[in-house]
Amino acid sequence: MFATQTRINQNFNSIPDDLFEAIADLKKELNAVILAHYYQEPDIQDIADYIGDSLGLSQKAAETDADVIVFAGVHFMAETAKILNPNKLVLLPDLDAGCSLADSCPPEEFGKFKAAHPDAIVVSYINCTAAIKAMSDIICTSSNSVKIVKQIPTDQPIIFAPDKNLGRYVMEQTGRDLILWSGSCIVHETFSEKKIVQLKIEHPEAEIIAHPECEPNLLRHANYIGSTTALLKYCQESQEQEFIVATEPGIIHQMQKREPKKNFIPAPAMNNCACNECPHMRLNNLEKLYLAMKNKTPEIMIPEETRVAALKPIQKMLELSFT
């Protein structure tokens, strides 16, 4: 049930001097749209047609009239675009751009977990494989997870997968008792509570803003919790001038562009490393994006049976997001 992809040896192609111009030319030639997640490197964000979180990117993928979708993100995002657009060419610059959270929920094991709770419906966070989506009743994102769970009858048992931290946050916000799959994101679990508290002492006027994939002991220090889009909006609307940002630091590029006079401090990891950067998101770069468009590969392909099954819960999410 896993999505399959095709590769090409990208070493055979020369790289033009002006990648921005070359990519712009290919966009016109292919009638392509470039969708990029906030966690991508700044150059990719700057050349993208749309930058957003998982919900916004899903909505754009569903709406686009482009013939080619170039997805600057990780593979579950590109899979979602393909699920919504079976007749379009969907490209992912680097097929190794996976997701630790999606990998934490193997389909075979999740199938057994689901079978152990036959009366429960499955609400799956969009950060999962096409195979898990196909086993789900409703998909959600960090933007709409609380809203979606609130719309489910209170007497209906719910399995929430794969992110246990987002699941705990949804439980807290809704008062619902969810059956949680124990998955997590390596980036959002690497932030150091001790170092963030120390940062707050050093920057007493700064507000701590955090993504709900962070662990509960960190979220309790946050002045605001939200999806990447919600964090971005909050920084724009807040009167405060300094923020400690507890999510992947790629979002700070957009924060600085929209609020250049404000100061944004990346939340530190437990170790002295760049572990607060997603290693999968950072596999993409302009060169790979150009080569993907030039060669029309790597292409995302999903077995039709899996795609059709995965489409239903995604459509349900999109419907509930507008109610």
UniProtKB/Swiss-Prot annotation:
<dbReference type="InterPro" id="IPR023066">
    <property type="entry name" value="Quinolinate_synth_type2"/>
</dbReference>
<keyword id="KW-0963">Cytoplasm</keyword>
<dbReference type="GO" id="GO:0046872">
    <property type="term" value="F:metal ion binding"/>
</dbReference>
<feature type="binding site">
    <location>
        <position position="99"/>
    </location>
    <ligand>
        <name>[4Fe-4S] cluster</name>
    </ligand>
</feature>
<dbReference type="GO" id="GO:0034628">
    <property type="term" value="P:'de novo' NAD biosynthetic process from L-aspartate"/>
</dbReference>
<feature type="binding site">
    <location>
        <position position="185"/>
    </location>
    <ligand>
        <name>[4Fe-4S] cluster</name>
    </ligand>
</feature>
<dbReference type="GO" id="GO:0008987">
    <property type="term" value="F:quinolinate synthetase A activity"/>
</dbReference>
<dbReference type="GO" id="GO:0005829">
    <property type="term" value="C:cytosol"/>
</dbReference>
<feature type="binding site">
    <location>
        <begin position="211"/>
        <end position="213"/>
    </location>
    <ligand>
        <name>iminosuccinate</name>
    </ligand>
</feature>
<keyword id="KW-0408">Iron</keyword>
<comment type="pathway">
    <text>Cofactor biosynthesis; NAD(+) biosynthesis; quinolinate from iminoaspartate: step 1/1.</text>
</comment>
<keyword id="KW-0479">Metal-binding</keyword>
<keyword id="KW-0004">4Fe-4S</keyword>
<comment type="function">
    <text>Catalyzes the condensation of iminoaspartate with dihydroxyacetone phosphate to form quinolinate.</text>
</comment>
<feature type="binding site">
    <location>
        <begin position="125"/>
        <end position="127"/>
    </location>
    <ligand>
        <name>iminosuccinate</name>
    </ligand>
</feature>
<dbReference type="InterPro" id="IPR036094">
    <property type="entry name" value="NadA_sf"/>
</dbReference>
<comment type="similarity">
    <text>Belongs to the quinolinate synthase family. Type 2 subfamily.</text>
</comment>
<keyword id="KW-0411">Iron-sulfur</keyword>
<keyword id="KW-0662">Pyridine nucleotide biosynthesis</keyword>
<feature type="binding site">
    <location>
        <position position="37"/>
    </location>
    <ligand>
        <name>iminosuccinate</name>
    </ligand>
</feature>
<dbReference type="GO" id="GO:0051539">
    <property type="term" value="F:4 iron, 4 sulfur cluster binding"/>
</dbReference>
<keyword id="KW-0808">Transferase</keyword>
<feature type="binding site">
    <location>
        <position position="278"/>
    </location>
    <ligand>
        <name>[4Fe-4S] cluster</name>
    </ligand>
</feature>
<feature type="binding site">
    <location>
        <position position="228"/>
    </location>
    <ligand>
        <name>iminosuccinate</name>
    </ligand>
</feature>
<feature type="binding site">
    <location>
        <position position="142"/>
    </location>
    <ligand>
        <name>iminosuccinate</name>
    </ligand>
</feature>
<protein>
    <recommendedName>
        <fullName>Quinolinate synthase</fullName>
        <ecNumber>2.5.1.72</ecNumber>
    </recommendedName>
</protein>
<dbReference type="InterPro" id="IPR003473">
    <property type="entry name" value="NadA"/>
</dbReference>
<feature type="binding site">
    <location>
        <position position="54"/>
    </location>
    <ligand>
        <name>iminosuccinate</name>
    </ligand>
</feature>
<dbReference type="Pfam" id="PF02445">
    <property type="entry name" value="NadA"/>
</dbReference>
